A protein has these predicted regions:
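ATP-dependent phospho-/nucleotidyl transfer catalytic cores
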Residues: 2-7, 32-36, 60-61, 67-71, ...
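Active-site Asp-x-Gly
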Residues: 68, 242-263
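ATP-binding glycine-rich phosphate-binding loop
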Residues: 24-49
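ATP-binding pocket architecture of kinase catalytic cores
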Residues: 53-76, 82-160
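Catalytic-loop Lys-Pro-X-Asn motif of eukaryotic-like protein kinases
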Residues: 237-238
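Active-site beta-strand-loop-beta-strand hairpin of nuclease catalytic cores
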Residues: 46-56, 244-248
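Juxta-kinase regulatory segment immediately upstream of eukaryotic protein kinase catalytic domains
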Residues: 1-32, 80
Length: 263
């Protein structure tokens, strides 16, 4: 078996043992780092079932420094998987959502001897991310993927979802932190270069010109004009996978699935 590790991965022996928990008893052919995410440690595991072709799944160690309650991330994923069983995408166009791969004992996660939480999800085959918008058609597909996913989860009751990153999208909170930091900082430091000074002033001006809008969404939520809906909290361009013909086929990185404002 081939095991390639990254600098933030678990030791090869324990990584193999953990992957085996999700492999349904099948031999593991390889384990390799997957993607360029900065939060979780992510690996692509390939197994070799006796009766079928090789199969692959994604293995992740959830970063408990970011997600303080990893079990809630996994719980949300389980709720999503269950919801989509009865709310499949319309026929006529491919669309897939990663689903939970359970352990041999039927659990949604595995906790190792160090207390780390590991989970496995299905791998979306024949699709890949693109880091930046390439053209108008690509932008259209990104929009389609974002809309398709949120249409599918629109009937999911937000009471069933935990808020895995409380305050993640609350702009006034960030603005308040910025104001405190600005008051404490020495903005007249003579050690900065002219370029740094201009860049800093550009940022200060940018925020000053827009800060009156920072409370709009939260005020609308408080007044009942907007309500919480199930959302993907981090729908970056490279979280939408494209098929070989350029069509959006999946929205991945579902750790930030949570109640929020879709606006």
């Amino acid at each position: 078996m081939s095991v390639a590790t990254s600098t933030n991965s678990a030791p090869p022996s324990s990584l193999s043992d953990i992957a085996q928990q999700f492999a349904s008893g099948n031999p593991i052919i390889s384990i390799n780092p997957l993607g360029n995410g900065n939060i979780n440690s992510t690996f692509l595991v390939q197994t070799n079932p006796i009766a079928t072709a090789p199969q692959r799944f994604v293995l992740q160690r959830i970063n408990a420094q970011v997600f303080r309650q990893p079990e809630l991330v996994i719980q949300n994923m389980a709720v999503l998987t269950e919801h989509l069983k009865n709310n499949a995408a319309p026929a006529g166009r491919r669309w897939e959502t990663p689903a939970i791969v359970t352990t041999q004992s039927g659990k949604n996660y595995w906790q190792d001897s160090a207390g780390e939480y590991w989970r496995a999800i299905s791998f979306i085959e024949n699709a890949q991310p693109v880091e930046t918008i390439q053209n108008v058609e690509h932008a259209r597909e990104i929009g389609y993927g974002l809309a398709r996913f949120h249409h599918l989860i629109s009937t999911l009751n937000t009471d069933r979802l935990a808020d895995t990153l409380e305050g993640f999208h609350i702009t006034p909170t960030y603005l308040a932190t910025y104001e405190r930091t600005k008051q404490q900082a020495d903005l007249t430091s003579k050690t900065s270069s002219d370029i740094e000074t201009k860049q800093r002033q550009h940022c200060l001006d940018f925020i000053a010109q827009r800060q009156e809008w920072a409370h709009v969404l939260e005020n609308a939520k408080a007044s009942g004009q907007l309500k919480l809906r199930p959302i993907h909290g981090d729908p970056k361009v490279n979280n939408i996978l494209l098929s070989k013909n350029g069509q959006a086929v999946s929205l991945i990185d579902l750790d930030t699935l949570k109640p929020g404002l879709i606006h």
